[in-house]
Regions:
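Iron-sulfur-associated redox domains of electron-transfer enzymes in respiratory
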Residues: 1-181
Length: 181
């Protein structure tokens, strides 16, 4: 979806496109630069897409997202997402649960039947800084192999602000910008 959006919009209709699976970045970008709100991708995050797929196949299931950032809790509380994602835990909270339950991972045996080898490297890389942009670039290569995309990645809200300031100054035209708060 984002690859098609980028190809259709940049630079013909807008100078650049912003993307991220980080709600903190998206909210910050839209608050600091409301004029850029339409430049920030509205594509659903993997958390929401996965939860919706689970709910479609198992309507009574409870979905739990476990990740590094508490900002995902804000995303899960959005009116349009509330019914999809039931709980969000940070890694720190999950480790606290394991600790309280006396679960020691170093003593657990791996079960080969539980191996999850169906995902792709691009899909697994979404949560890593620059991972969304890398997936978009890869998808663009399949759609339009001759199209070159310049990307910039900002890690931390301070660096994201700098990146957006450069975009506002017209120094990131044609770029795909990814931020991670």
């Amino acid at each position: 979806e984002e690859a098609r959006d980028f190809l259709e919009e940049v630079p013909a209709k807008q100078p650049w496109m912003g993307t991220s699976c980080c709600p903190a970045w998206s909210v910050m970008a839209k608050k600091l630069y409301p004029e850029f709100a339409d430049y920030i991708s509205m594509a659903l995050t993997p958390m929401v897409i996965t939860a919706r797929m689970v709910k479609k196949d198992h309507p009574d299931a409870k979905t739990v997202f476990i990740g590094p950032c508490s900002a995902k809790k804000l995303e899960a509380n959005r009116r349009t997402i509330r019914s999809d994602v039931d709980f969000v835990l940070t890694f720190e909270e999950m480790l606290g649960i394991f600790d309280a339950a006396d679960i020691d991972f170093s003593k657990l045996q791996a079960n080969p039947e539980d191996e999850m080898d169906e995902g792709t490297g691009m899909g697994r890389g979404f949560a890593v800084g620059g991972g969304v942009a890398a997936a978009v670039v890869e998808a663009v290569k399949h759609i339009d192999p001759d199209r070159k995309i310049q990307i910039e990645y900002g890690d931390g809200l301070k660096n994201c602000r700098k990146m957006l300031a450069m975009a506002k100054a017209g120094k990131r035209d044609g770029y795909l910008l990814e931020g991670m708060g």
